[in-house]
Amino acid sequence: MDDAGERMRDFWDDRAREDAFHFVDPRETFGQPDEERFWRRGAQEVDALLELLDLTLLKSDHVLELGCGLGRLTRVLAQRAQHVTAIDVSPEMLMLAQDHNDGLYNVEWVLGDGETLAGVEDASVDVVISHSVFTHIPSPKVQLGYVTEFGRVLKPGGWAAFTLSTDPGAHKAKPPAAPPAGSSRRGFLRALVGQAPTGKDQPEWVGSWVPLDALGATATQAGLFLERIEGSSTRRTLVRALRED
């Protein structure tokens, strides 16, 4: 693992300790997650992703999920597929995921290196899913490297569904500000004492975007055909890619 991978691991380990539920789904109130709603939204997001990209999971599928976090989507995928390989860069997230999903006997939890799918054999999976993960990766090069890896691990005829940002204006960190006055100052002070989220000004949260032409060129080199792209030029671009024979 290089320095970039180490930084991502350290960042997401810190966020897992701080409030894993909020950082996996920022709609959850920091420090006060509604766990039932959190898991329900995971199922809804799997359904929405598959519906928008016109995809269907088969009970015989071996699914690889990149960036599983707490296993919010993993839980649903495990119910619908034969086997799930759930990968995350953060050992803290993986530990929590296993604690919250200890009944998922068809899931293999794997610690990733933040850059590759090392350890996953060539042409060994039917489906790759990665949702709201690339958006937080600071390097477009790393994102495109993962696309190349998708082409390597997918069986011919297999498919990948993933989200990434194609909006260059969506990844600008706000500069550090002086302690504000009034109610904003109270929020600033809450962050100082651990009552508000931290780290959202760091590159590992701010993330980066990928030009569509670079995505297309990388996919072609990896043996992937980009069958469908929804939401181009936005922070939430959905991609369906087919592994060609």
Predicted regions span which residues?
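A short acidic, Gly/Pro-enriched loop at the edge of an enzyme's catalytic core
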Residues: 119-128
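A short SAM/SAH-binding and catalytic strip from SAM-dependent methyltransferases
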Residues: 127-141
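Class I (Rossmann-like) S-adenosyl-L-methionine-dependent methyltransferase catalytic domain
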Residues: 1-55, 60-62, 66, 70-77, ...
